Amino acid sequence: ESQMEQKNIEVQRKKGLNLMMKILITAIIPLLILVTFAGLAIRAVGVSVSDKLMQHELKTSIYAVNQTLSVISSGDWNVDGDQLYKGDYNISEHQDVLDAFKENTGLDVTLSWNTTRMATSLVRQDGSRETGTEIAADVYQTVKEKGSYFVSDNVIDGQKYYGYYEGLYNSDGSMAGLVFTGMASASVHEIYNDRLKKNIIFMVVLAIFACMFL
């Protein structure tokens, strides 16, 4: 009789465990599906928000660049050969100003005369500066007509960039060239994916805790 009772207890215990597993599985699967869809939704919305935030940050950084250049010299933009000047100040000889801006903000800066890059913190794979190359004519035209241009997939020397362009203007209102600020898309995506990963981990942990208290 004692053995029979023990078997019954064991059977009931197994039934209880099986029931608990069924409850957990029934609860966990929908939660995992919910977490997956929530993660995809966050990613979709996040990409859009990321673009808008980058556009705002790059636009703000151009204002900072312009203010810095105004302090350096109040003169108009001009060129002498392959040298870019603002007033009497030779920007091409002092590109360390742009390098310092990049070091402090993580953003690259380029100054162009018309569509030709004359001074930049952008460096090619061989270590030389990305000067003497051309900015697309349609970008220049868009800035001339609309005042600015934002792009999330600008390709420079084979690398994609988030970029924002505005005009470089002389005292008479004429547009002498362009000012560009940008960040490599890979760097932006790395920052965004890191935040997304943390959010998903938090949601998974939350789902596990929810299952434990069902």
Predicted regions and their residues:
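Membrane-proximal extracytoplasmic alpha-helices
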Residues: 41-76, 183
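Extreme N-terminal signal-anchor transmembrane helix of membrane signaling/transducer proteins, especially
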Residues: 15-45, 200-214
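Glycine-rich acetyl-CoA-binding "A-motif" of GNAT/NAT acetyltransferases
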Residues: 175
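Short N-terminal helix-loop-first-beta-strand/juxtamembrane motif that initiates sensory/input modules
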Residues: 56, 60-72, 96-118, 148-151
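Helix-start (N-cap) segments at beta->loop->alpha junctions
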Residues: 158, 169-172, 180-197
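Non-catalytic regulatory/interaction regions at protein termini and inter-domain linkers
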Residues: 1-17
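Extracytoplasmic/periplasmic sensor domains and loops in membrane signaling proteins
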Residues: 92-106, 119-156
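A short beta-strand signature within small-molecule sensing/ligand-binding domains used
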Residues: 148-151, 158-168
